[in-house]
Amino acid sequence: MMLEPSIDKLLDQVDSKYSLVVLEAKRAHELRDKERPTKEFKSVKRTLQALEEIADGTVKIHPAPELKRETLVEKRELERLQAKMKEQLIKEQIAKEEAEEEAKQKNSRAAKAAAAE
């Protein structure tokens, strides 16, 4: 049974088998955590999907790991802020709808009181 992509093709993309295993594991974890894929996959398993991306050259070892960590921290902070903003917008929309509903009820009561007089 021949595995695709072949180890030779994979080793053309990285320096060593060790680097390949580390890159594959990290990318598989990223894919599991809903990181955006770089292509359509033939495989269903995350580890094989990571190998497909490595073989295509769309995933590389980051030359500056500290910079990548900073980028990831910034990305997570941005996602957190976006979620917070979305939550705030929803709260504002709810407050607006409640105020409109309260105004309608107030007008309805006023109309009923005027009709009763």
Swiss-Prot record:
EC code: 2.7.7.6
Transcription found in the keyword field: yes
Keyword Transcription set for record: yes
Listed Low complexity bias regions: 108-117
GO molecular function, a single term: DNA-directed RNA polymerase activity
Top-level class of the enzyme under EC nomenclature: transferase
Cystine pairs: none
Any single GO BP term: DNA-templated transcription
Reactions accelerated catalytically: RNA(n) + a ribonucleoside 5'-triphosphate = RNA(n+1) + diphosphate
Alphabetical list of SMART domains matching this protein: RNA_pol_Rpb6
Compositionally biased residues, Basic and acidic residues: 96-105
Region (Disordered): 96-117
Keywords noted in UniProt: DNA-directed RNA polymerase, Nucleotidyltransferase, Transcription, Transferase
Gene Ontology cellular-component terms listed: DNA-directed RNA polymerase complex
Lineage top rank: taxon: Bacteria
HAMAP family membership: RNApol_bact_RpoZ
Subunit structure: The RNAP catalytic core consists of 2 alpha, 1 beta, 1 beta' and 1 omega subunit. When a sigma factor is associated with the core the holoenzyme is formed, which can initiate transcription.
Family from the record: Belongs to the RNA polymerase subunit omega family.
Protein's job: Promotes RNA polymerase assembly. Latches the N- and C-terminal regions of the beta' subunit thereby facilitating its interaction with the beta and alpha subunits.
Descriptive protein name: DNA-directed RNA polymerase subunit omega
Organism the protein comes from: Lactococcus lactis subsp. cremoris (strain SK11)
